[in-house]
Amino acid sequence: MKIFSAFICLLPKGLQYAIGTLLGEIAWLLVPPKRKRLAIGQILFCNITDDPKEARRIAKASTTRFGRMIIDVLRYPEIKDGAYKDMVEFINREYLDDALENGRGAILAAVHSGNWELLGGVLASEGYPLISVAMKQNGDADKFINEYRRLMNQHVTYKTGVREMINELKKGAFLGLIMDQDPGDDGVLVPFFGYETLTAAGPAVLARMQDVPIIFVTIHYSPYSGKHEIEVHPPIYVERTDDKKRDIAVTTTLLNEFIEDYIRRYPEDWFWLHNRWKWTRRFYGEQIETPPDVYQ
């Protein structure tokens, strides 16, 4: 991959992204039919559209965009020393600056929408004390992506204990947590697209314990400006009452409402190939209504 990255960095920008477009089309061709059915089914069940053809278009667009994402990452050696600034535009950056000045840390919540890898790299390169909490992947893939993350001054830690995360928050760190995927049995059951859905409770739990804000930061590529728009959203604070479970559920519901609204705004940007209701269906399928299991 590093050889391919070096080759990409030698090419004109237009050719770089033409290759990205080709890679995205190839990726869609390689997606198994049952995974395509899953993506299309979830789009329909979430009422993004009621037209199967439009659902297929959205599913394809949400997959082919990975070609451009890959090119953005492969360009890290080319953009790491400040050239990335020409690729992005910040909206409402003051929310991050206020949290940084406060010095008490923050939870930066993100979703698998747009180029979340570039988002983390840009925030770290801009001097924000970001620690991205990730899941460990394949050894070779991990080695490559972490080496490239370091090019953008990004620090990544694998999913770790609450105590370690709290220690980082006490140092004033921004903990980056992606919270839109199926958390398995670690989640809390709250509404999402009209269905009770297991959802990651980590952001609400940590924010409540340390009384720090949860700040959603999103990224969307605008074909009109030719830039990635990094939008920082108003901070969310967890209400602290005597009922801890209620506080976490209420806040996680608010977070899901934000994610749902954002996905409806940019449906082609989200990762529809992910089986979002897999564990909800497995644990609660006979007790509550869930989207039909189309992944067969």
Predicted regions and their residues:
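Short, flexible segments with low predicted structural confidence
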Residues: G14-L15, I71-D72, G120-G121, A141, ...
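Catalytic core of membrane glycerolipid acyltransferases/transacylases, capturing the structured
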Residues: N102-T160, D182-V188, Y221, S225
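Short Gly/charged-rich anion-binding patches and loops
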Residues: I3, L38, E94, L118, ...
